[in-house]
Structure formats: C-alpha cells, structure tokens
Amino acid sequence: MSTEQELQIGKVVKSHGIRGEVVVELSTDDPDIRFAIGEVLNGKQAGKEHSLTIDAARMHQGRLLVKFAEVPDRTAADSLRGTRFFAAPLEDEDDEDGFYDHELESLRVIHEGEDIGEVTGVMHGPAGEILEVRLTSGKETLIPFVHAIVPEVDLEEGTATITPPEGLLDL
C-alpha cells in the first residue's frame, strides 16, 4: 500500500536510553492500537523503508517510548531518527468533522477574502492541533486549529478560512 492511501501515525524524534528505545511523536488518536506489542510498523526515512516489530511501548513523561525487535541498542535507535510510520486507516477513522494532517498540509490560508499563506505542517499538542503557516510575506506563524479561529476548511477548494483574534498574525 502506498503512503498516499496510508496515514502517518508517528515519527521517531530521538533515541532514549542505551537499550534501543526511541521516542515517537504521535499523530494518531489510537496509540494503544497502532503501537501494540507485536504490531509490525511500516517506516520510511530518506527514501528507505523499514518494517519494524514492536517489542514494547510505554508512556514516559508524556511521550511514547517504543522498543523494536530489530533495534538492539542506542546506535541502531539513533539511525531511526526521522523515520515516519504509516498505516492504513482504521475502520472507525471516518470522522466527518476531523481532518488528517496530509489533508491540511498545503491548503491555502484565506483571511478576509485574501490568500495570506499556506499550511506547511500540523503540530499536535496536549491542548489540540496547531497549524504551521508560511505567510506570503515569508514569515512563519502558528494558528490554533480551533473552530473559532479556523471556521471553515474546504478540501475541494484547497482552502482554510481563518478569523484570527487581533494581533495573532502580527507575532
């Protein structure tokens, strides 16, 4: 299955400890299913593909630590930095009101009828998602992805309309 049909579910941020664990930045609402012991993940990194089997996964200080069967030590874990994991959508992931990161990335950002920039990424935090936007001026800004600030996303038109509070775009 190609990554166009799959969803990114996480990304290796760095190694952790000396036993080959890695810190995974999650981009799934189902880490207990996606990162269950015995699951085989499809990883992609700089044109290389990896199939990695989960030996253990645990939360530690708000981060997911994963140990893969194929990764014996820190050196091997370090080599996985930047690896992105992809998987087919789960059957219950047809949320009418939700969006996947890949659907939001590259949307044009519209404010008061004007194209002011492009969504370049989506950050996931404890308080919710934040859109990373490159403004037409070249500046980068962050916009909370909440209905009050982003009231309309039109995937067919490729736009996200924003109504930011005063000063948000001036930062």
UniProtKB/Swiss-Prot annotation:
InterPro entries xrefs: PRC_barrel-like_sf, PRC_RimM, RimM, RimM_N, RimM_N_sf, Transl_B-barrel_sf
GO BP term, pick one: rRNA processing
Pfam family, one: RimM
Annotated ranges, domain PRC barrel: 96-168
Record-level GO cellular component terms: cytoplasm; ribosome
Protein's cellular compartments: Cytoplasm
Gene3D superfamilies, per the entry: PRC-barrel domain (2.30.30.240), RimM (2.40.30.60)
SUPFAM superfamilies, A to Z: PRC-barrel domain, Translation proteins
One of the record's GO molecular function terms: ribosome binding
Keywords assigned: Chaperone, Cytoplasm, Ribosome biogenesis, rRNA processing
Function of the protein: An accessory protein needed during the final step in the assembly of 30S ribosomal subunit, possibly for assembly of the head region. Essential for efficient processing of 16S rRNA. May be needed both before and after RbfA during the maturation of 16S rRNA. It has affinity for free ribosomal 30S subunits but not for 70S ribosomes.
Recorded family membership: Belongs to the RimM family.
Record note on quaternary structure: Binds ribosomal protein uS19.
Domain remark from Swiss-Prot or TrEMBL: The PRC barrel domain binds ribosomal protein uS19.
Name this polypeptide is given: Ribosome maturation factor RimM
Source organism: Corynebacterium glutamicum (strain R)
